[in-house]
């Protein structure tokens, strides 16, 4: 398969303008605060869109429709996963974000050193670096197979083009380039997704006809009996709600790639608004690419040859390629190029943020501990940060060649990787924020036990939904640390690192914040009703 010259021209212009924008934004960079948190001068709306774009990767565009249309046990039930988002945002806005922003830190793991000790900080930083770069390799892999399919380029060239273009504009522009490019990419991506949905409904004879041809068993069924704890129902209601809650708490509240956007805000109130907007806007976006999955599923029912036309992986159709195959077969020249630009946009909006956060954590938690850097200028430190960004980008590219067999659905693959550590991560931050006597030794022992327990579930308890790993890891980490500290910890921490209502009021707590929490809870109820009656 190959694309026409006009499509290549569209792609080239987009990538060229992206690098040009990054070069322009780089001229104001003077130090690490400029490079990693944009000197804390960014508007909440821009940061909210950037955070949303980071979450909406190419793997979501590929994986969500594949899950809805084809995955065993899948269907529109994926929307149940979104119930947890508004609830998790409320908790993040009340308990987690205020403490991080008050400390004026770049790496969120610096909080763990202030609250516990150095080894806890380095352990969590290392865990983040290891898991996040591996998940980034999955992202690069997912979009590169699409580039290979549409353009006719080899997989190797597809990986290199995607990886190095992202590395170049990330190195040049830093977090500010990431924020503005994410906004552009989000506009392109949303526009293309809406176009694809309208195109599908048009060829299927309308919205109602699309649902009529969609297999009935793949519609949402809210079964409150199934629990996913050994009953084989991996995507039952309870693991998606409760497990999803802890997953999103960890991802949005205790993951550097997301929280770093919150640390770019002008003030505490603007930062609160970022998470509020994400809690509202994420569901419509997820609903959009799930509806595309409905359209693809309906299209495959009408066109029986469609599934057989999908490339095979171990003799099984690669359903992750269903959307791009449909686009290639149906869209005119030029529009295919725009579609590929949208896929590039989705991939880059995830990759750029992750690479910058990997660089920030490496620089702040490891490199800057070397006293020799005290003799270097701010410009030299900036150079080191860019060099570290390049290193992580190259490593992610290399890993992309080794992640093919993790899961048949790339979206599930990424969430499985994250779910191994999400529970322990939120567990250790909760210990810091909510308890006064737990020390670093207790926290580290809890983290290790939580991770090992999740690993045991993956290897030996296949019937337990991976969504429960987020809960199991949290409970084990929290309980073990509490028990250990009861016997071995006599110290009490600085109260400024532990949440209290008095502390919360000092952060600017007001009626606007209360209204946001109420709106998010109402939004949770609305989403539940939409899912129940859909």
Task: Label the predicted regions.
Residues 1-534:
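Membrane-embedded helix-loop-helix hairpins and adjacent transmembrane boundary segments
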